Design a protein with these regions (language model features):
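Conserved acidic residues
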Residues: 99
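A conserved beta-strand element that flanks and buttresses the S-adenosyl-L-methionine
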Residues: 102
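Short catalytic micro-motifs in class I SAM-dependent methyltransferases
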Residues: 105, 109
Length: 194
């Protein structure tokens, strides 16, 4: 398992581009969200601040103490909070606590053998009929490898893990993306708990 705190301590964080996910920002241009929001694997909180700027109560969690300390040191936008926490050990603390879970490639940062557990925890944290907005790294099924993180995923795997518990409301390949990522490498899904 990757030592996420060490990566933040040593500044070895190529995934941190210094600003919020362009794909999430693109989604927010056409949609709104209301209620409590959880951002797992929030890192330095760029997505947390973007979501909080839309007048939401947003909680960012990360397993890295260093990442959370740095996130807290950045000026507060509005209604955001941060907590050092392991997404896989939040069940009792956050059971049915959120209207939304919004994440940018967090699912792709965890080892594939943890994916089913991720979905179970996600379902437990959402209120009835809660929403899940996710940005996934895409790869053709024939190109999926075990090297990671990130562990890229194909659309068929998204269906396998999520469609049992969620209805798909919308999905798209974002036109906005980090410059270093090729167009078509991200897949945005907006889902609602059944």
């Amino acid at each position: 398992m990757k030592d996420w705190d060490k990566a933040y301590q040593e500044g070895e964080t190529p995934w941190d581009k210094g600003y919020a996910s362009p794909a999430i920002a693109e989604w927010l241009q056409k949609n709104s969200l209301e209620g409590g929001v959880l951002v797992p694997g929030c890192g330095l909180g760029h997505d947390v601040r973007l979501l909080a700027s839309h007048n939401n109560q947003v909680t960012g969690i990360d397993i890295s103490q260093t990442a959370i300390s740095k996130a807290k040191a950045i000026e507060v936008v509005n209604n955001e909070s941060y907590r050092v926490a392991d997404f896989f050990n939040l069940a009792e603390d956050y059971s049915q606590s959120f209207d939304w879970v919004v994440e940018h490639t967090f699912f792709c940062a965890i080892a594939p053998d943890l994916r089913q557990s991720y979905v179970e925890n996600l379902v437990n944290m959402l209120r009835p009929k809660g929403y899940y907005l996710a940005v996934f790294f895409l790869k053709d099924p024939s190109q999926i490898d075990s090297e990671g993180p990130p562990y890229k995923i194909c659309r068929e795997a998204v269906e396998k893990y999520f469609w049992k518990n969620f209805n798909l409301l919308d999905s798209f390949i974002p036109t906005s993306h980090y410059e270093c990522r090729p167009k078509g490498s991200e897949y945005v899904c907006w889902m609602q708990l059944k």
